A protein has these predicted regions:
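Surface-exposed beta-strand edges and their flanking turn/coil or helix-capping segments
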Residues: 33, 162-163, 188-191
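Residue-level detector of short, conserved catalytic/binding motifs and their immediate flanks
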Residues: 9, 163, 234
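Acidic, serine/threonine- and glycine-rich low-complexity intrinsically disordered segments
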Residues: 119-154, 159, 209-213
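A cross-family detector of function-defining hotspots
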Residues: 71-93, 141-156, 216-225
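Structured segments of extracytoplasmic/periplasmic soluble domains
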Residues: 129, 133, 165-168, 204
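Preferential activation on post-signal-peptide N-terminal prodomains/segments
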Residues: 1-137
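Amphipathic N-proximal alpha-helical interface segments
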Residues: 86-113, 147, 151-184, 237-246
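Extracytoplasmic/luminal low-complexity segments enriched in Pro/Gly and acidic/polar residues
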Residues: 185-246
């Protein structure tokens, strides 16, 4: 059956790739064209359509990262030097068409002022303020065209990171929410390839479909208490659905 085919294929490919890894000292190893062709063929048998142009072409060794998030108390101390209760978000704050400022999207800094997006210039000023207040902003990249910032570490996205800020009529911060890591500490390095993650495609997308995007990044896991770990993962879009394969 399809599952057996995929499992058998993965075993063969893993043995093949281990040989390649053994003869290279680089952190990145190129996947041969014939391996990619075979993988795409197996995926088609499992109900997935994928273009060769978006199939990942390499095996990459990435470290995990251990961290803690800024708490509400941390945010209050950073901004005001004392404990201040941020106002509960007004239910009337609704994202308008073309504005993602009040919707938490992957990798974005988010800004809102009522139902109107804060200008890109104002957003940039807010981020400068965050840096002055002590936020770890390493790897933050500003997308001028989109008007938001996203988070990168060693050239790879940290999924589901955001800082959301709303301003009152006087331009003062009246609401703030963040899922943003403090300083990251490198952990165990893990070799990750999309071929090894193929066996998780069917459980994640039982109906199959067209794979539109594959992106390497980090998913978040709780390590107990206030501690968290970012682990290398694939963010896969099949048709209009997005799943993270660890």
């Amino acid at each position: 059956n399809i599952k057996s085919i995929m499992v058998g294929f993965l075993i063969v490919m893993n043995l093949f790739m281990l040989g390649i890894i053994a003869v290279t000292t680089k952190q990145q190893s190129i996947v041969p064209e014939e391996v990619i062709d075979s993988a795409i063929s197996v995926m088609k048998e499992s109900g997935f359509e994928i273009g060769k142009d978006i199939f990942p072409k390499s095996y990459v060794a990435l470290p995990s990262y251990n961290t803690q998030f800024y708490s509400a108390s941390d945010l209050s101390e950073l901004f005001f030097g004392k404990q201040v209760a941020f106002r509960t978000k007004d239910k009337s704050l609704v994202a308008t068409e073309g504005s993602a400022v009040l919707t938490v999207n992957n990798n974005h800094f988010l800004y809102g002022s009522g139902s109107t997006a804060v200008s890109s210039g104002s957003a940039y000023s807010l981020v400068k303020t965050l840096k002055k207040k002590g936020f770890d902003m390493k790897g933050a990249v500003y997308d001028k065209e989109a008007g938001y910032f996203y988070r990168m570490y060693n050239g790879v996205n940290l999924f589901n990171m955001f800082i959301e800020v709303s301003l009152d009529s006087d331009g003062e911060i009246c609401y703030m929410k963040a899922q943003w890591p403090k300083k990251l500490v490198s952990g165990e390095r893990k070799r990750i390839s999309f071929i090894e993650s193929m066996q998780k495609l069917n459980p994640a997308f039982p109906a199959g479909g067209k794979i539109k995007n594959i992106e390497l990044g980090y998913s978040l896991k709780s390590a107990g208490g206030e501690k968290f770990t970012f682990t290398p993962s694939w963010r896969v879009q099949v048709d209009d659905q997005i799943r993270i394969l660890e």
